[in-house]
Amino acid sequence: MGSRTTISILVVLLLGLVQLAISGHDYKQALSKSILFFEAQRSGHLPPNQRVSWRSHSGLYDGKSSGVDLVGGYYDAGDNVKFGLPMAFTVTTMCWSIIEYGGQLESNGELGHAIDAVKWGTDYFIKAHPEPNVLYGEVGDGKSDHYCWQRPEEMTTDRRAYKIDRNNPGSDLAGETAAAMAAASIVFRRSDPSYSAELLRHAHQLFEFADKYRGKYDSSITVAQKYYRSVSGYNDELLWAAAWLYQATNDKYYLDYLGKNGDSMGGTGWSMTEFGWDVKYAGVQTLVAKVLMQGKGGEHTAVFERYQQKAEQFMCSLLGKSTKNIKKTPGGLIFRQSWNNMQFVTSASFLATVYSDYLSYSKRDLLCSQGNISPSQLLEFSKSQVDYILGDNPRATSYMVGYGENYPRQVHHRGSSIVSFNVDQKFVTCRGGYATWFSRKGSDPNVLTGALVGGPDAYDNFADQRDNYEQTEPATYNNAPLLGVLARLISGSTGFDQLLPGVSPTPSPVIIKPAPVPQRKPTKPPAASSPSPITISQKMTNSWKNEGKVYYRYSTILTNRSTKTLKILKISITKLYGPIWGVTKTGNSFSFPSWMQSLPSGKSMEFVYIHSASPADVLVSNYSLE
């Protein structure tokens, strides 16, 4: 235990304080993949332009036993249940991403896909809200669904529909759905005014229903308690819905609602360390702060300033500048809980991203109890979280499926883990799916492109195993806030500088060393006068000071410039005084990382290390080309 603690402290010192450096990540590719994931989660009749070809129609009789059409919507995660509360939060945050960064989405060719993803959800919500005071909040139940491991196209589990009404209220569910519809009405205001008006009509009705008939939805839909329990209650959703209805309508009624109920409903009292499908206060506080910065506080300015104080305490806690800070892993990732921690990473990163822009708009810094934070520093923090997700972490693992080379291959997801229904229509039985597909150790037959899995534990450890649902199960609400962050990071079209400042290097920042001719000859080496086909380029990407000592982060790129595949690789590294990631140590040398067995012609691999000295001496001591 002592050695583990020592190592953790060392890594905290070395990584936790790292300031953001310019990254080589392809945010545009990550954005495209993260939006594509929603097509894999679709329920209902799939459209002709469906891009995830291994999926097919499913849930075609949902709602029939209740006399209502509930075909459509999204499966929330790796199961086949349609849970209304997280689905609505997913749609709300997708809409917020589009509202803030629609220009960037459009310039990168993804706005249409993002809007389609929203409409797939809102079309379902319209069906689920057949009367002003009736809302269907779940189709299927977790208990029977989790007993089986089947493709959604042929599931045999119970598809009962569950609703809330005036006698069985659910203010949190109705409030969140009202927020989703209101936010979506903004998204469709220009492209489809009539649809926007329809969404707004549902939003008004749902808010009135939520506010008039109060109660927690999981007291009415009790089958949801084990899976999406409403721990925070419904006051946050009522404020959240009012905030979005004000954004959509500019109606003073909703502004007054936020002003008059902020204190009694917790909007001005709760200082949060999370934002997600259950707890909305940080989101409410951020939206109200935006209203205040736009000069629209009016008679409620004093109350709105208290909202803003709580929003800024949340932002300060993200950067370790508050009296109560959000915990992070040694590698620097926000850590809230073991089960699907990544949902809190993306949602907090999104709030930090939009707040950095709000601060820039109002030309002010964030005043924290432990020091001030500039808008660019807040954006740098969001970027650091995204870069961690995409592979800049102690394991050099991408937690977005299909991005990079080292990403999860055994995702806890029924559809991706079973051969596509379009390829093999042989029936997969309820329990047979566990025996044949869940328990197999190979990679998923269908790549769940863009899925953001639950992620590592508190010590940056991760096990890519299908039964490790806490870490390998994805969810729609993991991806939704990420859309906005990625869109913001891609370009500077908002007018804010995307080239974030870095620390000027003290040692020589770039060292390019051709690998020497190998001593042994598994293949014929090049002539002595010829350059080696395996080259190494080192670059100092960041530096920071801790307790008077300067630490440096180096990125090392090894490139195969030959016309053949590099099969055997031995790297000699000397004068290394800190941790290294992205290679495997074998004896006194290093080789390919565990997820790589060879390096094709023209390709490169990267590994990184941190220490408080000039670059280490890195040489290729042996290699084989085939």
UniProtKB/Swiss-Prot annotation:
Region (Disordered): 515-536
Catalysis performed (reactions): Endohydrolysis of (1->4)-beta-D-glucosidic linkages in cellulose, lichenin and cereal beta-D-glucans
Residues the record marks as active site: D79 (nucleophile), H412, D464, E473
Compositionally biased residues, Low complexity: 526-536
A biological process term (GO) from this entry: cell wall organization
Top-level division of the source organism's lineage: Eukaryota
Signal peptide: 1-23
InterPro entries referenced in this protein's UniProt entry, alphabetically: 6-hairpin_glycosidase_sf (IPR008928), 6hp_glycosidase-like_sf (IPR012341), CBM_49 (IPR019028), Glyco_hydro_9 (IPR001701), Glyco_hydro_9_Asp/Glu_AS (IPR033126), Glyco_hydro_9_His_AS (IPR018221)
Compartments (UniProt record): Secreted
Similarity-based family: Belongs to the glycosyl hydrolase 9 (cellulase E) family.
Name this polypeptide is given: Endoglucanase 19
Source organism of the structure: Arabidopsis thaliana
